[in-house]
């Protein structure tokens, strides 16, 4: 299955890395590597994530996985998996939609 990454995700990860690097460059690199490794896991096992509909009060076909302090939101298509957003796990996910 192919992997697509929303351009917003790439930009957000860049900002996330810069923010974390202000305190700890090594941790910033490690965090971003872990997130990209999670993307690869999702690509290989697209149904590994939980259904987001179980955490929110509206219908959605998004799935999510936790990666440290972050939540990766994605959708599974017929030929691809698309990463839509990576958010802080303490952020109110419902405000994204």
Where are these regions (language model features)?
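Basic, Lys/Arg-enriched alpha-helical interface segments
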Residues: 2-55
